[in-house]
């Protein structure tokens, strides 16, 4: 439908990337190519994968890089070296050790601390560890429940945030981790 809309205003796509939950068979790809007036090798699947980091390798394996270069009239040389990227994926997938990290913050939205989560994940991969991240809402941290809330965490990250809301819980978490020798990284309040 989106391709039809593009074509109705005079735009003809050169490459289609299809989001899909599972691998599509050749017949479906040929049908899409035919109905959308694109070459079959320019219909690329972006199927659900265990990790977003596998997408570049999957796209290259389907020839997306070659298709784009060809459509742009650029010379097609050697494939980009994805060796370091594949090594990263291999380390990520084969990590056997696990570390539990608690994120103490006040924002419930999963994406609020996305860069922190990804940084921890990358650091874990670099150190051959899987990182289990538990969100701990600082608004509900008290002296009475802090031990239970931080139980089982190998380390704590105290996340940034604006305004007064949740600050008391962050201070309680910082005090508890300092007095109980739990490694802590504070990204706010001058920590």
Over which residues does each language-model region extend?
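N-terminal beta1-alpha1 cap of cysteine-dependent amidohydrolase-like domains
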Residues: 1-191
